[in-house]
Every structure is written in C-alpha cells, then in structure tokens.
C-alpha cells in the first residue's frame, strides 16, 4: 500500500491554544501562540518515545497495566496508516497522533489480548456499554478498529479532522489492496473528567471543557472536544473507572490534570463502521474555527 498523504506538505497556522478567559479572571492577559503544524507518517526511527508518552497519557492511571512499548511497536509496524502532528520537522517528537489497530488481526499478540480483555471487562461494568461488551466477548472477535489518538493538552482541536480524513483515505486504499482494514466497527478510546473539590491551595486552572451530564447532577467534561460529536454517532458510549486510582487532590508532576481538582475517567465510543465518515464530517464542522 503506497502512502498518498499530501497534507503534511501544507502547514496549518492556528492560534489561541489557551483556554477562554472567564469572568473572574478578566484582568489576566491571554497569550496567543501561532504555530505551524505538519502531518507526518509514523516514523519508527524517531517516534517511539513520543508515541509511548502519548499512550501513557491516554491510558492515564491504568497505563501501567499494559506493555506500552509493545503497543508502540505495533503502531509503528504499520507506518502507512495513521498520522503524527509535529511542529519542528519530521525528526522532532509528535505533539499528537492517531492510528487504528485491528483487534481481530492482532488478537494473538499479548498486548492486544490484554487490551481486549481490559476493554471487555470495563464495558461489562457499564450498562450503557452493553453492545460493546457483547462484541468484545464474541469468539472470534469481530474486525473492530481500535482507534488510539492523543495530543498534548493545549493542542487545538483543529488538528484532528485532517488526521481522521487521512485515516479514512488510507483505510480505503488498504482495502483496495486487500489488506485487513475492512472494519465492522470502530472503538475510540478516550478520556473525560469530572470536577472535584481541590485539596491544593492554589489557583484553579482548567482545561478547555465541553459539558455533558453523566447522572447524579455531575458534569462530565471532554478532554477531546470532538468526542462530543462522535458520541452522537455512536452505537453506545460511556465512561469507565480506572482500575488504579489517583488520590483525591494528588499533585502528580507528570500530569498537571491532578493539580486542577479533577477526577479523570476513561471513555469508550463504539461507532458502526460505515458511519465513521459522516461522523468525521460533523467533527470537521464542529471544530472549524470561526470566520
């Protein structure tokens, strides 16, 4: 399968990566940073550590459960599928990435076995994820495309649509070449959070947020704004509790999130295979910057 990615040759200039100024901080000065982003194929020679760190961020407290090195190697073993986003050229670390892994094709690999078992177990604990739990329990497992994507916390959502658009093209070309990427479903692994009373005596600073009720009058916020759109197209979606818990209010030097008085949770979104393209179009419109 030949790579036919062109967007990496066209820089996209975006600014305003900080959060909006709220009423109680009107006297603060907002910094606007203009950055040119470039899209690249995954590069086995340079992207291993950057992708592994982003995977650790994605799986949060439960990242220790998985062999992230093996998972990173699996992502890099299909360099013609998926994208990274960088700002300092191809040899620099990725600021964002997106890829898809075939759970059926890789079912015998230990890291995929662990992931599939984990996802099935978590889905079975949330009634809203019952359709996903049933799919993951089938033997053999259906050709589910596991979408893994993460980015640095202040990366603008505008980098997302090009990654998904290129992924759809690459999947179509792979299917033409009779490669195993004809997915029945797509499963997006992501993260949400809830605000909790912070035990830290410091000024609160939240990530940009999109609200969604999750029951019991608790607001659920999206780290990835596009997830709100994907959930509208989903067969099912819902939050999952991490196996390993963060202490309330714990300051974690590797995750600024814990300094902000928030509780993070995993998020799973199951989309019917043929419906992903329409979902991506809606995401493109949703994150489009105002004219």
Swiss-Prot record:
Q: What is its main location?
A: cytoplasm
Which InterPro entries does the UniProt entry name for this protein? BCP1_family
Q: Write out the GO cellular component annotations.
A: cytoplasm; nucleus
Where in the cell is the protein located? Answer: Cytoplasm; Nucleus
Q: Name its GO BP terms in alphabetical order.
A: protein transport
Keyword Nucleus listed? The answer is yes
Q: Which Pfam families match?
A: BCCIP
Basic and acidic residues bias: where? Answer: 1-11
* Location of the region described as Disordered in the Swiss-Prot/TrEMBL record: 1-25
Keyword tags = Cytoplasm, Nucleus, Protein transport, Transport
The reply on keyword ATP-binding is no
Cited function: Involved in nuclear export, actin cytoskeleton organization and vesicular transport.
Q: Which family does it belong to?
A: Belongs to the BCP1 family.
Q: What is this protein called?
A: Protein bcp1
């Amino acid at each position: 399968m030949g790579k036919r990615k062109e967007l990496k040759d066209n820089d996209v200039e975006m600014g305003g990566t900080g959060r909006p100024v709220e009423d109680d901080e009107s006297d603060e000065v907002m910094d606007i940073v203009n950055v040119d982003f470039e899209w690249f194929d995954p590069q086995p020679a340079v992207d291993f550590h950057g992708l592994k760190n982003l995977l650790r961020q994605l799986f949060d407290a439960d990242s220790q459960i998985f062999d992230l090195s093996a998972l990173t190697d699996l992502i890099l073993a299909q360099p013609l599928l998926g994208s990274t986003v960088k700002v300092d050229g191809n040899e620099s670390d990725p600021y964002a990435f997106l890829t898809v892994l075939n759970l059926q094709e890789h079912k015998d690999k230990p890291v995929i076995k662990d992931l599939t078992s984990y996802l099935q177990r978590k889905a079975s604990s949330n009634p809203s994820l019952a359709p996903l739990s049933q799919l993951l329990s089938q033997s053999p497992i259906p050709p589910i495309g596991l979408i893994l994507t993460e980015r640095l916390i202040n990366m603008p959502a505008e980098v997302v649509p090009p990654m998904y658009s290129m992924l759809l093209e690459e999947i179509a070309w792979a299917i033409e070449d009779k490669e195993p990427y004809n997915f029945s479903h797509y499963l997006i692994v992501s993260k949400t959070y809830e605000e909790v009373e912070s035990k830290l005596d410091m000024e609160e600073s939240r990530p940009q947020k999109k609200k969604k009720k999750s029951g019991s009058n608790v607001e659920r916020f999206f780290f990835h704004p596009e997830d709100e759109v994907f959930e509208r197209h989903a067969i099912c979606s819902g939050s999952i509790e991490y196996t390993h818990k963060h202490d309330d209010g714990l300051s974690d030097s590797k995750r600024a999130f814990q300094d902000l008085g928030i509780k993070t949770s995993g998020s799973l979104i199951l989309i019917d295979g043929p419906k992903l393209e329409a979902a991506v179009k809606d995401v493109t419109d949703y994150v489009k910057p105002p004219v």
